[in-house]
Amino acid sequence: MSKYNLSLNLTVCPFYSIAFLQNQYPLVSSISLSANPDSKTISNIRVVLTADPDVIHEASWDLDFLEPGTGSILLNKSVRISSEYLSGLTEQVEVLLKFEVFSGDELINTVHQSTALMPKNQWAGFNGMPDLLAAFCMPNSEFTEELVRSVSETLSASGLPPQIDGYQSKTRDKPHQMLSALWNVIKSKQISYVNPSPSFATKGQRIRFPDDIKRTPNAACLDLAMLFASAIERMGLNPVVLITREHAFVGAWLIDQCSQFVTNDDPMDLRKKISNQDLIIFETTLAALGSKANFSQAVDSGEVLLSEDQEKDFIFALDIKQARKREIRPIPIYEKPSDEGAVATGVE
């Protein structure tokens, strides 16, 4: 409470990135004012937001007056941050937000809040909007499309129908065949496994995009899980990404369904769907360089990770199709052809 008997209450996201902006998550989700019962009526109120460094457009909120002992929620107004600036970040930037309250020309209160602007490849973890992990599933990247083309060739070489046709067959066999072929394709890329960041599930980590994996080629467990999920979505199937305390792996629906919610923290429910052959999960790190495991062995390993014995480590499963229904879109990646302007790639 300030000496002017006026308090300013804020809800500010502690971290923010292009994924938040792209999917319309507000940086400042609420602003309210309240006056003490013993205060005088305050008139011509304006709340002004500025930032240091100056990376956020100045914003202001107006209120005609505030009676003693009353409060007011200010009209919602989005705080504008340059998408170009957020897309170009390569390191985290700490930003100090300053909210100043004026009555006419008189400054009567100041509140400071901080937020961290993250690089576009940074996921904030389970403690920071876990749904936004779906933004890192990138079905339209060049490497994803390359993988899916190779899946068709692999199916054809095995004497199977080469069409990448999602659930059009109305059987569980064709999705399973596509997933098995995808496993072999990614395994052939000889991607080297690297350790994930400690406690990445709760604190988050940088995620290598598909084209980054192709270039290096290195990947941690979450990178591989999102690479598989990207290709699975590109094939017209519905991927599921599973997160435990120290690991990530992937799965897919064998029928054209999705979970009721974007995230599911009930391993028993997932095991039931697997038992009904509606869902298949597999350990993606076994597709990394040096592993001799086949797809069936990867499936067995995935089911062990979701078993009752491992429940204490399970955090959640992310359903990509349900996320898309909630309009969580992939992070835009801007390509710059030699003779054209920048082009953003995303879900069509």
Task: Map each language-model feature to its residues.
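A structural boundary/capping signal
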Residues: M1-E348
